[in-house]
Amino acid sequence: MDPKERIKELREKINYHNYRYYVLDQPEISDYEYDMLMRELIELEEKYPELKTPDSPSQRVGGEPLKEFEPFTHVVPMLSLANAFSEGELRDFDRRVREAVGDVEYVVELKIDGLSVELIYEKGIFTVGSTRGDGIVGENVTQNLKTIKSIPLRLKDDVSLVVRGEVFMPRASFEKLNEEREKLGESLFANPRNAAAGSLRQLDPKVTAKRDLDIFIFNLQKIEGRKFKTHIETLEFLNEQGFKIIPIHKKCSNIDEVIKEIEEIRNLRDKLPYDIDGAVVKVNDLEKREILGQTAKDPRWAIAFKYPAERKKTKVLDIIVQVGRTGALTPTAILEPVAISGSVVSRATLHNEDYIKEKDIRIGDTVIVQKAGEIIPEVVEVVKEERTGQEREFVMPDRCPECGALAVRLLGEAIRRCTGLNCPAQLLRGIIHFASKDAMDIEGLGPAIINQLLSKGLIHNIADLYYLKYEDLIQLERMGDKSVKNLLNAIEESKTRDLDRLLFGLGINLIGSKAAQVIAEHFKTMDNIMKAKFEDFTQLPDIGPKMARSIVSFFAEKQNVEIIEKLKNAGVNMKKIPKEKVNNIFEGKTFVLTGALGNYTREEATRIIEERGGKVTNSVSKKTDYVLVGKDPGSKLKKAQELGIKIIDEKQFEEMLKGENI
């Protein structure tokens, strides 16, 4: 490939994966694969310097911060580290350092696999904590960081300083969290790092407080009124002040000792109660660090040694298909057990049918397996030269292995999904969604009660909710006479919900509350929706081919039609309720919502505004007329204040609905 084209392709890939990792916290590739992409880009740009541009990801530290938290400019830029993957590269680093400053001592530390943060203390008091973001501007997550018990809120001395540390989740806490999420039908975190990042970025600090996060401090960024000679001295000082410093930090006299220590850490890796993805080598002398300086993206006085993902050879004994809580069918390889990274692996994800075809993975193949992100085992390569001719090709089923319903793969998607409302694999999540506030709004019917109803065999689908009796509910834990009667009343009241709420509550793939409104408004009855053809849906505004195929496939499934009939027989409303005439008090007005409202969900508030002629947008601009502010608002409030936009609270909003104070 032409170097210019390859550089362009690499930049696009890296920018995409930066976004997935830094902004969404949903990485798609392992750190090692990402590092290899970045390395190739850097090598090509060095070979062809005329192709290097200021906006290349090789010149950046990371991605942009999320917008939900207030942006915060770091006191000291939070640079990334250059990476080494071999002993030769470590020796090259050592040579460059010694050429610049002579003989040096190094410190070798664990490279914790977590989320990097900056903590600021003023006269001994913790004042601000922020995530790394793009290295220059991060997110202010002070309130969430205060929930981490290992972060001192007050230091031993009244000293002003800035430190950098790594927030992480211990493996035991990660496993416990995923077990709890599985019971509630929530999506599981892929690994402890993702769990730590997702937990720290919760808008509600109470959620963060329950997640058992921890932190290790690994660098003193800045301090007022004191001087230190070495990095080891700063760590000892920080420990005295009450910080939980990086637990393994060994002083080494030369690069040979460094290499030996890195190998010792590698051997220790599986025994640690938290994840590491390498070791960090730092110059110990702080004056020599100043002389060495830094590039635009990393310091010249430190380097990270990254351990490659461990790979092992084994055999594919079978390929089975598992059904997730969202109805996604995932092929899984059953393997001859093999020890990788301290655990025995007997299963590995194959992601989807395209992945199997692309790698040409067959039952009976000899394959190479690795643990991506140190957690999820995956098949990365087939050893085709070891094929015997007895291997069998795998065919992805078009029916759900759990319930037998049609499994549909929409155009442009890699995942095949079960369409069955009765599917046991997705039943808990489906009923939680059906009872949620924006769907049938059954007050008092939460995950804990739904879990009990399912485990006792009292319900097998959403329609069974409407056939529950007093004697069914009174046997449940924490359900007294009053709470049983309240729940039965809530179930009965939900029968009167509008058609779009019912349609949304069915959990049809791609059909959100807005699409459900459009469909219900057009077809008026559930019978009409069920009879409609693909082209009938695509003619509607905002309903594309994927959504049309999804809804047609859903109602083509016999078990779904039977459940609709059962709901109908229970007295659940199946028609569009004519809207009461409301005045267009918000005609031509643009609203932005920020924070949690007390009496409305975001969807309800949006619906109320739109029904009265208004429009709701996601960002504040000069064209915004009102910003409706709830509890814990984000940066939108600050921007509205800067632009002089009218800010209203929930009480003022309700007064406006009555025609007052507009």
From Swiss-Prot:
Annotated BRCT domain ranges read: 581-662
Provide the function of this protein: DNA ligase that catalyzes the formation of phosphodiester linkages between 5'-phosphoryl and 3'-hydroxyl groups in double-stranded DNA using NAD as a coenzyme and as the energy source for the reaction. It is essential for DNA replication and repair of damaged DNA.
EC no. given is: 6.5.1.2
Residues the record lists as binding NAD(+): D31, Y32, E33, Y34, D35, S80, L81, E109, R132, E166, K282, K306
Tell me, what is one Gene Ontology molecular-function annotation carried by this entry? DNA ligase (NAD+) activity
Organism (species): Thermoanaerobacter pseudethanolicus (strain ATCC 33223 / 39E) (Clostridium thermohydrosulfuricum)
Q: Which family does it belong to?
A: Belongs to the NAD-dependent DNA ligase family. LigA subfamily.
> Which HAMAP family does the record match to this protein?
DNA_ligase_A
Q: What protein name is recorded for this chain?
A: DNA ligase
Q: Where is the active site?
A: K111 (n6-amp-lysine intermediate)
What is one term from the GO cellular component aspect held by the record? Answer: cytosol
Required co-factors: Mg(2+); Mn(2+)
Query: Which gene carries the instructions for this protein?
Result: ligA
Pfam families, alphabetically? BRCT, DNA_ligase_aden, DNA_ligase_OB, DNA_ligase_ZBD, HHH_2, HHH_5, Nlig-Ia
Under catalytic activity, the entry for this protein gives: NAD(+) + (deoxyribonucleotide)n-3'-hydroxyl + 5'-phospho-(deoxyribonucleotide)m = (deoxyribonucleotide)n+m + AMP + beta-nicotinamide D-nucleotide
